[in-house]
């Protein structure tokens, strides 16, 4: 599936992943089964975080965790749609991720899949806001935490994206 995604660096050197299309629409709720199906295309792929040179793999657990995690279940409205559509830019979100933070594993259920702990990274993405004429009026920017597990096989796997927060002070107008 063709992805309409680009990475743009601002004057301060901060990178943002621009997703130029809204694949997952809906007045009421996100169809998470469609998002899960979309995410399966990434399974088996891997991407390097430029900031720390870690290779992050996409495991077969990501589509289900991303779409059915406790965090996803509590998302409503714009943040739910933001998470659903951020799926289009996962490779780029990983590549531009910064601010690595390590945390020990604390749950027995993750004793194998996160045997060596968890890493969190900051990333940013922007989604288009369309006018009544169907043209893009502006982009809303969101901060997000990329959650990565360090598996017993020694590899790092993207587990979920969390802490999605719209940046109110910044939207990119389109001329």
What are these regions (language model features)?
Residues 1-175:
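Ribonuclease/tRNase effector modules and their secretory precursors
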């Amino acid at each position: 599936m063709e992805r309409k995604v680009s990475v743009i660096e601002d004057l301060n050197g901060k990178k943002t992943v621009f997703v130029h299309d809204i694949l997952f629409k809906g007045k009421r709720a996100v169809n998470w089964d469609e998002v899960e199906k979309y995410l399966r295309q990434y399974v088996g792929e891997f991407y390097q975080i430029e900031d720390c040179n870690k290779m992050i793999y996409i495991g077969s657990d990501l589509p289900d965790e991303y779409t059915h995690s406790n965090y996803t279940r509590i998302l409503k409205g714009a943040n739910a749609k933001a998470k659903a559509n951020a799926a289009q830019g996962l490779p780029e979100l990983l590549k531009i991720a910064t601010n690595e933070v390590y945390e020990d594993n604390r749950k027995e259920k993750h004793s194998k899949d996160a045997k060596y702990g968890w890493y969190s990274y900051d990333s940013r993405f922007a989604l288009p806001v369309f006018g009544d004429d169907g043209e893009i009026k502006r982009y809303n920017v969101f901060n997000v935490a990329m959650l990565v597990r360090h598996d017993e096989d020694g590899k790092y796997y993207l587990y979920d994206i969390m802490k999605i927060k719209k940046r109110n002070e910044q939207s990119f107008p389109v001329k």
